[in-house]
Structure formats: C-alpha cells, structure tokens
C-alpha cells in the first residue's frame, strides 16, 4: 500500500476517535457542572479539560485567563481555528476520507461525509445550544457508526488495519491524559472533601467519560475506589479503553501490516505492551502515577513517530 494512502486512512480514523473523546469529556464536564459544587471545583473541572488536550495556552490567547464554561464549550466544539475542536476533527476526518475514497467502501465514505455535513447543520441551527448532552451523544454515536460500518463492510486488508491503528493510538493517548489530569485534580479536591457524595460523583464521572461505570460495577462489585479506577483504565486487557487494551489492538494490527521482525515500530509497541502486561497498580501508584503516565505518553508519541516514518507520510499532523 502507498504510504500516502495509509497516512490518510490512519488520520481519518484518528480524527474521528479524537472527536468522540472530546465529546465524551465535554459531556461529563457539562453534566457535572449541573451538580451542586463550589465555584473553585467547577473552575478546576473546565481548566482540567483544557489541560487534557494541552490547549490552555491557545484558549487563554483567545479568551483571556478567566475560564468560562460557555467559552470552553465553544472553543472545543465549534472553533474551526482549534484543530482539536469537534467540528475541526470531523472536517479533517472527512477530508482524509475523501482523499482515499476509492479505498473505502461506499458505506464508510457516506458515513464520514454525512457526519461532517450534519455537524455543520446542527451547529448553525442551534441544536448544540438547545441540548449540549444530546449533541455530544450524537457525536459519540457517529464515531461508533463509523467503526461499525468499517468493520462490517471493509475488506480486512492493510487499509482496514491502518484505520484500526489510528483509532487505538489516539484512544491510548486520550485515556492516559484523562487519567493523569483527573487523578491530579482529585488530590486537591478530595483531600479537603468530606462529602462522600462528592467522592462518588468525581470517580463515577471519570468512569462514565470512558463508558466504564457499568464495567467497573461488573468487575469489582464494590464501591468506587481510586486505585481500582486506575487499574481498570490502565491494566485491564478486557476494558476497551484501557491502556493495555489499546496496546493489544495496536500490536495485533501492526502484525497484519508488517511481518518484519526487525521493525522498530513493532519492537517499541511490543515493549510498551509487555511493560503494561506485567505492571501492578500498587507499584505504579507507589512510584508515582503522574510520572508513569507522562512516560507512557512520551512512549506513545515516539511510537506514533516511528509508525509514521516506517509506514506513513512523515509529516506533522
């Protein structure tokens, strides 16, 4: 497969996944903002959202130091100058799909194209302002639809596997950022909190942002504990959005696009996966969760760079 074709496929799925992840964290923040809480807690929640995407400097340059929820929502949803906003991600996903339209099935192309057209219509008509949660659910649904149509109609050849690689590298990156920022915020908020309800809503909101609330209940059958939330989102191989689950998918799909045992990309991915496989959550927490996740993000970024050099078009996207 031509590297440029693989590049477009990789970024098509990566941008679609990024739009979904942004919708997830925005929805949870919006729902949490409706609960009784201090102004400081509310402010920290919205600032944390910008930190997850490393967009605080860009936001501050446009809106100033005061973080207002409405401004954050506009910046992360409809700002076309913000490359990580939902509208920008869906536009970029569609443009990458259009570039390789002949490689995709009709159903996949129509899904990407219709999603882009529909999100523009919804933002112009005021649907987002009338019901933000419904809008975020729609974004998540369209991402699910894109993956489902891809799995249900695409030949499982190299094109299919590059699509999957984009999805799971992006998902691993997002989950690591989410856990890092939310657990860091928890140190400040929960250290002074005596309200058990607050404790519950904080951790349950993290789980809901990755569709993990019901999974947690099924796996642990107990009250929500921070160390178990971390274990679920980092080390559980059967959790769809865990770091280990994502790296398993990355390795499986890499194996389908190269049989070269000396591939540096496969070597790095395999080492990162094995480090997660044999890690224990108590050791991670004892050594410092932030340090662990920072190192993980660095290694994922390096993995993406090696993948680009080996298979894709090595440009900054």
Regions picked out by a protein language model, each given a short descriptive name:
Residues 1-317:
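Alpha-helical transmembrane segments and their helix-helix packing motifs
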């Amino acid at each position: 497969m031509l590297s440029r074709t693989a590049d477009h496929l990789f970024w098509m799925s990566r941008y679609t996944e990024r739009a979904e992840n942004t919708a997830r964290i925005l929805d949870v923040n919006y729902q949490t903002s409706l609960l009784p809480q201090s102004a400081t807690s509310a402010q920290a929640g919205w600032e944390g959202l910008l930190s997850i995407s490393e967009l605080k400097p860009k936001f501050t340059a446009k809106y100033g130091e005061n973080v207002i929820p409405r401004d954050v929502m506009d910046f992360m949803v409809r700002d076309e100058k913000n490359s990580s906003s939902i509208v920008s991600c869906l536009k970029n996903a569609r443009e990458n799909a259009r570039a390789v339209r002949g490689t995709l099935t009709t159903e996949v192309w129509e899904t990407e194209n219709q999603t882009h057209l529909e999100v523009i219509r919804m933002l112009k008509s005021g649907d987002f302002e009338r019901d933000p949660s419904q809008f975020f659910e729609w974004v998540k649904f369209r991402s699910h639809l894109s993956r489902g149509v891809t799995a249900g109609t695409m030949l499982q050849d190299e094109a299919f596997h590059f699509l999957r690689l984009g999805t799971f590298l992006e998902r691993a990156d997002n989950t690591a950022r989410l856990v890092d920022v939310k657990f860091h915020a928890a140190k400040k908020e929960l250290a002074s909190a005596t309200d058990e309800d607050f404790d519950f809503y904080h951790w349950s909101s993290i789980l809901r942002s990755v569709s993990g609330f019901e999974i947690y209940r099924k796996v642990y059958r107990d009250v929500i504990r921070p160390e178990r939330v971390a274990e679920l989102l980092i080390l559980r191989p059967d959790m769809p959005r865990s770091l280990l689950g994502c790296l398993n998918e990355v390795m499986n799909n890499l194996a389908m696009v190269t049989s070269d045992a000396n591939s540096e990309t496969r070597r790095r991915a395999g080492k990162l996966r094995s480090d997660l496989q044999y890690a224990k959550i108590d050791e991670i927490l004892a050594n410092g969760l932030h340090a662990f996740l920072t190192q993980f993000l660095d290694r994922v970024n390096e993995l993406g760079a090696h993948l680009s050099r080996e298979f894709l078009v090595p440009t900054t996207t």
